[in-house]
Amino acid sequence: MERGTSDEVGYATGLWHMVQAGLRELFPGYFALIMATGIISLACGMLGLPILAQALFRLNIVNYAVIATLMLARLIGYPRLMLADLTDHARGPGFFTSIAGSCVLGTQFVVIGHESSVAWILWGVGVTLSFTVIYAFFAAVTLRGVKPDLETGINGAWLIATVGSQSIAILSTLLLPTAGAYKTALVTFALIMYLMGCMTYLTIIPLILYRFTFFRLTPAELTPPYWINMGAVAITTLAGATLIMNAGRSSLLTAILPFLKGLTLYFWATATWWIPLLLILGVWRHLYRHFPLRYSPQYWGMVFPLGMYTACTIRLSQAVDLPLLAPVTPYLLAIALFAWSLTFAGLIHELVRDFGRPRLPESPARPH
């Protein structure tokens, strides 16, 4: 009996220390799980798979609640670590996923849940985070005295700034029917966020391509978030297509419709251009250089672009009347679902392993 009690106390102590260590080192970009699950759910709905779309929607509500709770717990328990991560060139952009995650879930509430009141709350969260997190990060990395060089300071996660802006543009456009007297203001805001997202992509992507081509790139440095090179323009395509499909609600959108169509096609072509190169780099990383393929939360940064490319291709084919794109979309969705399933299985395996064998840490990894 005493042995059993001692084991239970030891397990509980180990579990508590494991939770503390997990909060200290919590990956800032974990909202990418919500982004990936949400966009694949929406793509399933677009292709007539309502049961799967609903299941992923309900799962995403749980995902959001858990991750938001963990992030708040980390903010309360380890504010200095949160601030250090936010102002770090490499880890800081991960916080941008909270913007996109909130708005992607809000889009699910509109499209799948048919519940605009919750979507408005998530829209407010996304907009607030956009104007706090993004400007806090860029101000911090601009003003800090010691800065990394381009080789170590930039990565694909920087483009989540674009993803965040475009996710707000999409949700804002979808909320137009419930905006009432504020419809004109909301559609103008949606268009501004869309153009801001275009601006950030066109500003950041030359730096990433320059880093790719003129600096040594190791397998460890070729992280999954580099798929956001494609995902950022995929969501820009989806935002443009959403504005085009809702142009009848606004004289402003109607006036610039040819511009929107051309720009949207341009960004879809850019997203398509990236896919072969990213596949080649992935083969080089894992098959040629034998970099181990094991679960990391960063892989959600690869799953999201796959789902987003599927969704944007579906909507683009409808927005600009390009039916020739439609036949390929079920295959794109199958690939995205396969990638999501593997990554989610990796997450579950890691959780089962960690909670099954909690260990006492030797010492805290970083101070509060």
Which positions does each model-derived feature cover?
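Juxtamembrane helix-loop boundaries in multi-pass membrane proteins
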Residues: 12-42, 57, 79-107, 123-126, ...
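Short, hydrophobic transmembrane alpha-helix segments
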Residues: 44-55
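Extracellular/periplasmic helix-loop-helix junctions in multi-pass membrane proteins
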Residues: 50-51, 179-187, 247-258, 287-291, ...
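Central hydrophobic cores of alpha-helical transmembrane segments in multi-pass inner-membrane proteins
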Residues: 61-76, 130-139
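Small-residue-rich transmembrane alpha-helices that serve as helix-helix interface/gating elements
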Residues: 63, 268-270, 327-342
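Hydrophobic, ordered structural segments
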Residues: 103-144, 173, 187-190, 203, ...
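Generic multipass alpha-helical transmembrane bundles of integral membrane proteins
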Residues: 158-281
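Extended, compositionally biased non-globular segments
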Residues: 260-318
